[in-house]
Each structure stands twice: as C-alpha cells, then as structure tokens.
Swiss-Prot record:
Residues 18-38 are annotated as: Disordered. One of its GO terms (cellular component) is cytoplasm. It comes from Agrobacterium fabrum (strain C58 / ATCC 33970) (Agrobacterium tumefaciens (strain C58)). The lineage of its organism: Bacteria, Pseudomonadati, Pseudomonadota, Alphaproteobacteria, Hyphomicrobiales. Signal peptide: none annotated. GO terms for biological process: tRNA thio-modification. Its EC number is 2.8.1.-. This is tRNA-cytidine(32) 2-sulfurtransferase. It is found in: Cytoplasm.
Amino acid sequence: MNILTKIDDFVDQAGADKVGADHGPSEENGSSHPLFDNAPRSVSFNKLRKRLLRNVRQAFEDFGMLNGQKRWLVGLSGGKDSYGLLALLLDLKWRGLLPVELVACNLDQGQPNFPKHVLPEYLAKIGVAHRIEYRDTYSIVKEKVPSGGTYCSLCSRLRRGNLYRIAREEGCDALLLGHHREDILETFFMNFFHGGRLAGMPAKLLNDEGDLMVMRPLAYCAEEDMAKFAAAMEFPIIPCDLCGSQDGLQRNAMKDMLADIERRMPGRKDVMLRALAHVNPSHLLDPKLFDFSALAVTGASPEERREASPP
C-alpha cells in the first residue's frame, strides 16, 4: 500500500468516531497520539489534519528525507509552525510511518519576557524527549545591530549555530525546522528583489560541515493551514518579541505582496511553489547553469537532437 494511502486510512480511522462532538478523549484503540486526545472531532479538522500529514509525507518522499537519518532534532520556538511540525511528526511516528527518534529542542535566547516555563511543561506533559538550553544571543544581537536595523538575520544565524551544536551533542543526524510554503516563497522574492538572485529556502540542505541535514518537512504546507491547526490544537503559543517589535521588515513586505496576489488570483501561491520545482536553465540568463556558448545551428530536427542528447 502506498504510504500516502496509509495516511488517509489512519486519519480516517482516527476521525471516524469523532464526528458529532466538539472535543473529548480519543478512543481506547490508540488510533491517535495522546497529543490529539482533546483535538476537535469535526470533519473539517479531520480534513485539515489529513492534508497536512499528506503534505509532510510528500515532502519526505520528494526530497528523500528518510534516507539514512535515524535521530532528528526538532527545533521548537514556541510558535505555531514548530508546534505543528512536532505534532505532525508525532502523529506519523505513532502510526509507525516515521522510523526515526525525535528530540525536541528549544533554545531560550534571552529575549525579554520569555516565559521559560511554557515549553518544558508542555513537552513533559505530552511525553516527548526534549532539551531546553539557555544562550543569551539577544544581548549579542542588541549590541551588534545598529539602531533601526533588523534583528532577524543575525538572530537566526546565532540560533542555527547553537542548534547545530546541540544536534551533534544529542547524537542527531538531522535538524528539522518549521518553515512552511509562505516562508519559502517570501525568501525567494526577498532574494529576487533585494539580493539579485534566484534562490529560495531549500527543503533539504547539507550543512557546511557536512555532518548534519537541515530539513523542512512543512515545505508544502500553507501557513493558513498551520494557523488553523495550531488554533484547533490550542498550542501554548509564545510570541517573538524581537520580530513583532519591528516594522518595515523586508519579509513583511513580501508577505503582504503574496497575500495581495493570492487575494486577487486565488491559487497563485501553489503555482509559485510548483514553479520552484520546474526550472528550465536554458530559459534563464546564467551561463554557469547552461552552456550557451555550446549552442550551434546544426540543421537537425528536434527529434534528432533529442536522440543525440545523452539520457
């Protein structure tokens, strides 16, 4: 049976007895991870959950995320997306569809008013192996970034370096991050408009040292779906005071632009994401990707040229 069909089957089974009630404990047959005991019992939530699981599993298959990795560190910021990622991974693992060990990790970066108790209590409650580590990168960011500058880039780099270190210390071979479809598209357009290059946010990346995979299983998941999922699951969301306190960020401008396009032409975000998976180097302008100098008039028909080309 195809793995995506298995996902449909087990979500249907988990949701079959839920219709007609708003919330409540799941059946004793263990069809769902205990994290979902108090999840909504509606048809709409069941469809949302299934869609997200299929998107995650499709990313696993498309990008070879299950090739050789045995132990994953799941970055948990306290935001809706990282909570959702952890829940979906636990859902798959509970049903035997994810043959890896999971370790959740939160890096407390010393942000003002950060509620230190929320994540440890939540992770202990749901019985997930985890590590909470304090590193005051906030002070470094405040010191290094000039007044009026944006914190996100430096904050992200400092956080990533610490997560790499923690992953190694925990014996993990991959770091999983909760970036979704909109994050990837926003990054693409930031690079397009401000960086002068075509580059997005890879779903799977080998770090510079070559010892850790960085993976984004939510690459196909819509931010709107993740927000609905987080609200339905009632995750204890922790806001990011650093990002939320700054206006005029380039990413916010890209987010607004994409939202406007989607509002005027529904479905364009999915089309944009598909475009990132269908690249034609000969129709761009980068001679490093396509040898334009080798093009020559041969008189051969298209069929003959195809036959002469190496497979």
